[in-house]
Amino acid sequence: MTVLPCNAVAQMKRVLMAKISLIVNGNPVNANVDPRTLLVQFLRENLRLTGTHVGCDTSQCGACVVHLDGKAVKACTTLAVMADGHEVKTIEGLAPDGGPLHPMQEAFREHHGLQCGFCTPGMIMTAVDLVHRKGHDLSDHTIREELEGNLCRCTGYQNIVLSIAAGAKAMAKSDLA
């Protein structure tokens, strides 16, 4: 067995890094990442955007949903290198710091669409994507069907469905339609 000196291992790691350039929440980001780094890890650990949660690491719960080029994706099964050259929006990017909440965020607040809040960022990102894809007049059935990949262990979903329906209508009245 050959043992490599420590500096050789460090050099190999540098060589194996991938350079990525992307837009995150409207800001250009350039970074070197291990090609195996998940997008959720990159967002949370490298960029300190901790609103995107890791609930299952298996694409089952939806707590990690972000928008990649305007479409909802699960960041726990998306490699950071797959976002190279693309635009990512996280829950932090929906509303400006210190500014008003996004209409969907406001609807979740008004209609008590959360309890512990762990699933909420993923639910909201999924809901915004749903409105962009299906329009503002959503039936309860459509909302529930579209939420199949998002799990909540607290609320029983009724208030989440009400929140999404209200948020969809509010988005129709805003510039964020």
Residue ranges with predicted function:
Residues 3-177:
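Signature of N-terminal electron-transfer/Fe-S-associated modules in redox systems
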